[in-house]
Amino acid sequence: MDSIKYIKSKIIEKRDLLDRIAKNDLIYNSVLSLEKIQQFEFENNIELPQDYKCFISEIGNGGVGPGLGLKSLHDSIIDFKLRNRPYICLNKKFPYQNKWNEPWIASFDWDDDYPESEIVDKYMNTKHISGCLQIAHKGHGGTYLLVVNGFEFGNVWLDNRADYSGISPVLNKENRHITFGEWYADWITNLI
């Protein structure tokens, strides 16, 4: 896989910088065996995108990366933002192909009020990110999603519902949806 070879070369090139980012922790978690990955796919009735599968089996199952770093495969199926930490349903299709947000958010008077908890709970429900792994925490409750089921299979999306900004695809300079490999390669290329 070309993006994985490129990422490996950049890891070697930027090793000192990655060490500083990791702050003496492991740069990458241990890789997963293909057998464990296949078991995960079988248990969740999905197939992981090939570039992501190569990354977690050849480079690391989580570690340094965009935002606050990559989550492990196991941690990526839990929505850490919600109090009850629910599992994300992977065998249902991701429902979006274009940016999404609730219409009421644009017209809400944020200076004088706060939405009722029932409305917020519906907005934050994991059904909005079905078919996705939460692969990285961006900060301030935002998360990067990797679509593993649905039309957007293999593409990375940004979930900014924590600040009421909705869910949107991560785009490259040509305004095109990007894959996991492209997303990670772009991050590591642009490290200073």
PLM feature spans:
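Short, well-ordered loop/turn elements at secondary-structure boundaries
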Residues: H128-G131, K138-G142, F151-E152
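Low-complexity, Gly/Ser/Thr/Pro-rich intrinsically disordered linker/tail segments
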Residues: E182-I192
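Segments surrounding the PLD/"HKD" phosphodiesterase catalytic module and close analogs
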Residues: T143-H177
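Short amphipathic alpha-helical interaction segments
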Residues: K127, K138, N172-R176
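N-terminal low-complexity/disordered regulatory or targeting extensions
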Residues: I4-I7, S165, D186
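A surface-exposed partner-binding patch
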Residues: M1-K127, G131-Q134
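General helical structural elements
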Residues: Y87-C89, S165, F180
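Structured loops at beta-to-helix junctions and adjacent beta-edge loops in soluble globular domains
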Residues: E58-I59, L73, A136-K138, V148-N149, ...
